[in-house]
Amino acid sequence: MGNAALRRLAMPLAGMAVALFGQHGLAQTAAPAGKLTIEINKFEEIDGGGCRAFFLFQNATGKSFEGFEMSLAIFNKDGVIDRLLSIDAAPLPVARTTLKLFEIPQITCANISEVLLHDVPVCKPQNEANTDCYPMLDLKSRTSAPLEE
């Protein structure tokens, strides 16, 4: 089959893929190629105090991660660090979106003004050495508190 025939075949298939992904909203939320998108999707108050954070991890890096730990600084409405949290989000499979829930104790969701990604002490692709993840991170938040680097 020649290049022209392949192009004629590929164009309708590409159009169908766009139509299918667009129909379900997947194309708009896909992580940029080569990136690991970390999104705070929502906060939810915990009965008895505290805030539950829903994190989405979209792994478009081409690698699965067997180790991924974050150190987060939680700022209150006064701009003061309320607490530091260490979060283990592994495993993060390649080409998947993973939901992880983490509890932030003793602070209401409404009192969280910012979440700072302070450090990523563990970023270990499967069967590889620990690496610097910062260049591949894409941080987002759908909450009133931005996720910053």
What are these regions (language model features)?
Residues F57-T61:
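Asparagine-centered strand-capping/turn motif at beta-strand->loop junctions
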Residues N76-D78:
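Solvent-exposed strand-loop boundary residues in beta-sheet-rich modules
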Residues D119-E149:
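Surface-exposed edge beta-strand/loop patches
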Residues S64-G67:
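Short acidic/proline- and small/hydrophobic-mixed sequence motifs that coincide with surface turns
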Residues Q28-G50, F54, T143-L147:
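Low-complexity, acidic Ser/Thr/Pro/Gly-rich terminal tails and inter-domain linkers that flank the onset
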Residues R83-P125:
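Short, solvent-exposed, Trp/other aromatic-anchored flexible loops in extracytoplasmic proteins
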Residues G22-H24:
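N-terminal signal peptide c-region/cleavage motif recognized by signal peptidases
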Residues M1-L13:
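Bacterial N-terminal signal peptides that target proteins for export
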